[in-house]
Amino acid sequence: MIVLDASAVIEWLLQTPTGTRVEERIVSAVPNLHTPHLLDIEVAQVLRRYVAAHIITARRGQEALQDLIDLPLTRYPHDLLLWRIWNLRNALTAYDAAYVALAEALGAPLITCDRKMAAASGHSALIQVV
């Protein structure tokens, strides 16, 4: 069982060198991958920004979005995590805290590319940076 955050998923979807490392880390866990619903919005926003900045084409953005929809992820609503997200407010943004809170609740490692999130204190999640 693994929790994925948006930074790891965007790299995986765009098949970057970092995305290859993400895939190597999670391949044995498929389809036991978990994330808060927030991931979909965060990934869509990054794809939108990359298209606007001409980092990827609109077509590639659409393909990545479809790949996201097709991923075998178990998604969790935020309401179950809100109090823990709030309690992490001094160490993490609410966005990052959603992933950390889910990892804590499931007792699963969190895979991320975000070193700042991984360095935060005040939680019991096992965070693995790719």
Predicted regions and their residues:
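Acidic, PIN/NYN-like endoribonuclease modules and their adjacent C-terminal/linker elements
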Residues: 1, 88, 100-130
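Acidic catalytic patch
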Residues: 39-40, 60-90
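Short, well-structured N-terminal submotif of metal-dependent ribonuclease cores
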Residues: 1-38, 50-59, 63
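Short, structured loop/turn "capping" segments at alpha-beta junctions
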Residues: 20, 57-58, 74-78, 95-96
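Short active-site oxyanion
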Residues: 30-33, 73, 104-109
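Short beta-strand scaffold positions
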Residues: 4, 35, 94-97, 112
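Alpha-helix capping/helix-boundary segments
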Residues: 8-9, 39, 81, 99, ...
